[in-house]
Design a protein with these regions (language model features):
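Amphipathic alpha-helical coiled-coil/heptad-repeat segments
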Residues: 1-339
Length: 339
């Protein structure tokens, strides 16, 4: 019970960190608390003993006890390891950027070792209630059967700073924004304001990051389409181009996520080793820096196939904090099974 209380506290602290109102200092304090709690968790797992035998480090296995009045009336018992390197196993998978709009029919395979679960079809397009946001919602509706949860990332970041340009007939998702004179780095905010003025119609919100690059985000997960002359200079997208985003999956155990289908989006291929990222992780792995391959699988925001550098430890980032919440929940499930 004490270990379960520790895991509950870790999850609470991860939840506190999973919002951008936190500062670097406050997240550092939360991460330090989590590391201390994990040390306490491991201390219990490594030192709890009975009659000289360790009970919670994984060595108490296949032990036999006499329970009846006659010989050989016995019962065998094993207690799994409860240290942080053995609990919290969680599977993270992130697709590569999807490139085609289509109807997506998806089936998760062998979710319980035997049965398949079909997900309701979703249309990936620029319409309201469509896109990979709708697909993620459909996946989450059957998560009680599959054990798989989905999130999406439809954020497009320009590869270079906004240039000075005069754009014509600019439109997003079929909504006309018009002609616009744009300053370098959108210094006067004209471009961002023009896009955000119609964000309730397009579903797309704009901002400029610290490098002067345009950031376009679909809040409800619908796809984005762009049109206009010279828009590549200011938003980094060509005339009559589109952007769909990527899908992220998590399972609260270490098993691979198998699927088939995906229609023209080729979603099942997008999660393969050819562009997708997959990795299983235990609780102890979040104490230090998050390896760049693991960060990619966790769905850290990126425009390229892979993240190029390691990420800050544990709850030091928003995405890391959300991953720690999943890992802590998985660890709680493991301990519930052991009890």
């Amino acid at each position: 019970d004490e270990q379960l209380k520790i895991l509950d506290t870790i999850k609470v602290k991860a939840t506190q960190s999973a919002q951008d109102g936190q500062t670097t200092d406050s997240r550092q304090a939360l991460q330090a608390d989590i590391v201390r709690l994990m040390e306490e968790l491991d201390n219990i797992g490594n030192t709890t003993s009975f009659n000289g035998q360790q009970l919670l480090n994984g060595t108490f296995s296949n032990k036999e006890f006499q329970i009846g009045a006659y010989s050989n009336q016995t019962v065998k018992a094993s207690i799994g390891a409860t240290t942080s390197d053995k609990i919290g196993l969680t599977r993270f998978e992130s697709s590569k950027l999807l490139t085609k709009m289509d109807v997506v029919s998806l089936t998760f395979l062998n979710v319980d070792g035997v049965n398949n679960v079909k997900v309701a079809a979703a249309t990936v397009s620029t319409g309201l209630g469509k896109g990979i946001g709708a697909l993620a919602e459909n996946i989450n509706k059957v998560s009680d059967k599959t054990g798989i949860r989905a999130t999406y990332d439809v954020t497009r970041i320009m590869s270079k700073a906004v240039e000075k340009a005069s754009i014509q007939s600019f439109a997003i998702n079929g909504v006309k924004i018009g002609d616009l004179d744009v300053q370098a780095n959108d210094a006067n905010g004209a471009l961002v304001n023009a896009i955000n003025r119609v964000k309730d119609q397009t579903g797309v919100e704009a901002s400029i990051n610290t490098e002067g690059k345009m950031v376009l985000t679909s809040r409800d997960g619908r796809a984005m389409s762009f049109a206009g002359k010279d828009i590549d200079k200011v938003i980094g997208a060509k005339d009559k181009s589109g952007f769909i985003g990527r899908l992220n999956l998590v399972r609260l155990d270490g098993r691979d996520i198998k699927m088939k289908g995906g229609g023209g989006t080729k979603l099942s291929v997008a999660f393969s080793s050819d562009g997708g990222a997959q990795q299983s992780v235990a609780m102890r792995d979040i104490r230090g820096q998050i390896d760049k391959k693991l960060a990619t699988a966790m769905g850290f925001q990126r425009m390229k196939a892979d993240i190029s550098s390691n990420q800050s430890a544990g709850v030091m980032t928003l995405r890391g904090a959300m991953a720690v919440m999943d890992i802590a929940e998985s660890a709680q499930k493991t301990l519930d099974q052991i009890r």
